[in-house]
């Protein structure tokens, strides 16, 4: 009898697998532990395992069938062996049913093999018992589409999901009374069944309600684990002090932050915007409706409206008390007609700004403003747009205008009381001074040594000293009281002294032979001045002539040739100004009457013009034509002194009201320049006679102001005046400072006389 054949079909092997020897596998993979590692695909491993199982089963079946077909008689134990054989045979048949494959092999569209698996039928012992119920896979489609069908959708396999049965009203009432666990009262839209919560979802909701972490097993307070090892250390790991960088802000972080800040400022980093907003902004288009508008020029007759005046202090809600009207002023304002009122309002004070009421005349003011703009004509005033700095002359720097005196070179001490006057001789060697002590002193200019002195006034002070300008004879004139003294100091060389004495003595013979003037009655006129010799003591000291006039002499000025000199006696009336002739010993009164009190007089340096200054004006007279030439009006309240430029076309005036005035005689009778640099009265002014463009003034504030005055011959160019230096050294005593000054005839040196009894040489 042929052995029964096995009815199970073996799975065909699709490809041959190469045989790998044990030696090679051990050498290649080490220990060869490859449990769970698949050499090929899962399908191939399943096929190979199925083949091995089928071979073992075939071998077992053949052995069992041979045993059953044998004719041998069983032993005593044969019955047991037979039962055992039947049991094993039943087991084999059962295993055949269990080991039956769960798929079928079919041909696919390409002619290849395709495995179709059977549907799993889950039972209680199945591993798929926890699988969820079939879900509805209709997608995002409203369930109302299936209202007319018995099913509500399809599952993953395409089978219909039938509509669940609906409970009656009694069931709904029972469900609402006896609420099951997990009941929500909602219906699942995808299945149509009640939506209940699982135990896990209920636990999550409970944790959320109790402010706990929803995650199961999360410990918010775990046990602290030491940072290093958990072993307590006796010695510190590092005892180094804390570095300073831990207490200071990081420079590297500051650099990074500043880099980001610069990028934000430059626009390279922009704030985050959602893509939707960014797209909306890009889609938005903004159009400039005035983009193509061209600027049109205003009408030629258009004049802009004037701006309203800004409010003043009286319009404040809490103005100062002086702006608030009194009761009388308020009544007067209320009684005045509105048209006659100076202001349309009365200043009012309020404690705070919130208490200020509305302005009741706002509409009236706006209306009046509109009327003004509409009816009032407008006038355009053309203003010169000139830079004020361009109108100022460009003055040179004082350093470029040197030389001029800056420091004290020599100090002259010897007078008791004030030094009222001083003068430098034409050669620039000697300095003559006169003071309150009644003495005339002659000093050596460079060394400050006193060389000669004479006491000409017993009780009167020496008001003025002057040297004769000519160099053929050296004569010094001085005035003390109403006496004028002409003297020849004994310090000069014998030849010059002899010539000077002869010049003074020649006038006595002319005065003896001259006829005296008679009055209308035939009587002799009283002489204006008396020329005589002084006492023998004064003659021995060098004082040769004494001229007595009617009043105290304050000013002496010589003519450039040295034969005439003028004197001024402010207290006299008719004989205030006198002109003396040295060669004839003659004194003349040129003015019968002056319109004011004479202050000083001076000869023109090159022309026959005589200047006389009163308190407010300076008059110039032509001595040849004997007529008035010009009246100069400085505008000062009280003229103290004046001096004429060596060129003869300019004049400076000093006044007691602290003004220094420069006059251009060819330009105008008014001052060309007025300077106010002193705090007190100006006593004396003087030009430099040696060709240097310098002049100076002396003031009662104890200072001297040095100026650079450039005068050109071009009539189209004005004089340039630059203050260059302020000299301070004299002390102020009894409100008097510097009394007089004089320039060296050649050098830029200046000598000043002060009320402190000293003289100073400035170089």
Swiss-Prot record:
What SMART domains has UniProt attached to this entry?
BOP1NT, WD40
Which residues belong to the signal peptide in this entry? none
Q: Which domain of life is it from?
A: Eukaryota
Look up keyword Ribonucleoprotein and say if it applies: no
WD repeat residues = 414-453, 457-497, 593-633, 634-673, 677-717, 733-763
Note down the stretches annotated as region Disordered. 1-110, 318-341
Q: Which Gene3D superfamilies match?
A: YVTN repeat-like/Quinoprotein amine dehydrogenase
Subunit structure and binding partners: Component of the NOP7 complex, composed of erb1, nop7 and ytm1. The complex is held together by erb1, which interacts with nop7 via its N-terminal domain and with ytm1 via a high-affinity interaction between the seven-bladed beta-propeller domains of the 2 proteins. The NOP7 complex associates with the 66S pre-ribosome.
Under HAMAP family, the record lists: BOP1
Q: What is this protein called?
A: Ribosome biogenesis protein erb1
Source organism: Botryotinia fuckeliana (strain B05.10) (Noble rot fungus)
């Amino acid at each position: 009898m042929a052995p029964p054949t096995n009815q199970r079909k073996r799975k065909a092997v699709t490809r041959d697998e190469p045989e790998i020897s044990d030696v090679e596998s051990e050498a290649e993979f080490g220990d060869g532990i490859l449990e769970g590692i698949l050499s090929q695909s899962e399908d191939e491993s399943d096929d190979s395992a199925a083949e091995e199982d089928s071979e073992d089963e075939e071998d077992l079946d053949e052995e069992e069938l041979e045993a059953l077909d044998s004719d041998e008689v069983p032993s005593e134990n044969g019955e047991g062996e037979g039962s055992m054989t039947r049991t094993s045979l039943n087991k084999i048949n059962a295993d055949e049913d269990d080991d039956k494959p769960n798929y079928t092999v079919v041909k696919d569209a390409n002619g290849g093999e395709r495995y179709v698996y059977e549907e799993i039928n889950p039972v209680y012992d199945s591993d798929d018992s926890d699988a969820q119920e079939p879900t509805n896979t209709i997608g995002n489609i409203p369930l109302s589409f299936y209202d007319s069908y018995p099913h509500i959708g399809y599952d993953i396999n395409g089978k219909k999901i039938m509509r669940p049965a609906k409970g009656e009203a009694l069931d709904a009432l029972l469900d609402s009374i006896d609420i099951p666990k997990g009941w929500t009262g909602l219906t699942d839209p995808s299945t149509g069944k009640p939506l209940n919560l699982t135990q896990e979802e209920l636990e999550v909701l409970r944790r959320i309600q109790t402010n706990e972490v929803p995650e199961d097993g999360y410990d918010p307070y775990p046990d602290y684990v030491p940072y290093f090892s958990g072993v307590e250390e006796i010695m510190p790991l590092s005892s180094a002090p804390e570095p300073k960088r831990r207490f200071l802000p990081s420079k590297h972080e500051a650099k990074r932050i500043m880099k980001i800040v610069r990028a934000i400022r430059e626009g390279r980093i922009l704030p985050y915007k959602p893509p939707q907003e960014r797209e909306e902004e890009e889609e938005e288009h903004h159009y400039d409706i005035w983009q193509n508008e061209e600027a049109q020029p205003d009408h030629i007759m258009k004049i802009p409206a004037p701006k309203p005046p800004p409010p003043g202090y009286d319009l404040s809600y809490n103005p100062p008390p002086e702006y608030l009207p009194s009761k009388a002023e308020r009544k007067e304002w209320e009684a005045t007609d509105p048209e006659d009122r100076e202001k349309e309002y009365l200043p009012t004070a309020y404690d705070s700004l919130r208490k200020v009421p509305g302005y009741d005349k706002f509409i009236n003011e706006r209306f009046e403003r509109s009327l003004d703009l509409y009816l009032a004509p407008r006038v355009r005033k053309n203003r010169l747009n000139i830079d004020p700095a361009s109108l100022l002359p460009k003055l040179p720097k004082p350093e470029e205008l040197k030389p001029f005196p800056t420091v004290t070179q020599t100090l002259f001490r010897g007078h008791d009381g004030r030094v009222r006057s001083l003068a430098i001789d034409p050669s620039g060697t000697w300095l003559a001074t006169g003071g309150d002590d009644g003495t005339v002193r002659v000093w050596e200019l460079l060394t400050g040594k006193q060389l000669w002195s004479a006491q000409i006034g017993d009780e009167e002070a020496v008001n003025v000293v002057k040297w004769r300008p000519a160099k053929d004879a050296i004569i010094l004139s001085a005035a003390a009281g109403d006496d004028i003294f002409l003297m020849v100091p004994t310090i000069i060389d014998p030849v010059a002294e002899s010539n000077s004495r002869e010049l003074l003595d020649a006038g006595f013979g002319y005065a003896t032979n001259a006829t005296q003037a008679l009055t209308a009655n035939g009587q002799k006129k009283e002489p204006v001045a008396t020329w005589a010799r002084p006492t023998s003591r004064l003659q021995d000291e060098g004082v040769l002539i004494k001229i007595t006039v009617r009043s105290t002499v304050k000013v002496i000025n010589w003519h450039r040739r040295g034969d005439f000199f003028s004197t001024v006696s402010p207290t006299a009336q008719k004989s205030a100004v006198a002109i003396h002739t040295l060669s004839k010993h003659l004194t003349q009164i040129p003015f019968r009457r002056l319109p004011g009190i004479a202050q000083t007089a001076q000869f023109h340096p090159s022309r026959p013009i005589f200047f006389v200054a009163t308190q407010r004006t300076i008059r110039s007279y032509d001595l040849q034509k004997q007529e008035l030439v010009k009246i100069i009006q400085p505008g000062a309240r009280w003229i103290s002194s004046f001096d004429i430029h060596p060129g003869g076309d300019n004049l400076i005036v000093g006044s007691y009201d602290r003004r220094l005035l420069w006059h251009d005689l060819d330009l105008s009778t008014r001052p060309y320049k007025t300077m106010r640099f002193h705090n007190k009265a100006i006593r004396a002014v003087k030009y430099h006679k040696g060709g240097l463009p310098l002049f100076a003034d002396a003031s009662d504030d104890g200072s001297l102001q040095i100026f650079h005055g450039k005068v050109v011959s071009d009539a189209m160019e004005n004089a340039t005046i630059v203050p260059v230096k302020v000299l301070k050294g004299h002390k102020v005593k009894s409100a008097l400072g510097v009394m007089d000054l004089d320039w060296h005839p050649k050098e830029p040196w200046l000598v000043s006389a002060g009320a402190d009894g000293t003289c100073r040489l400035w170089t």
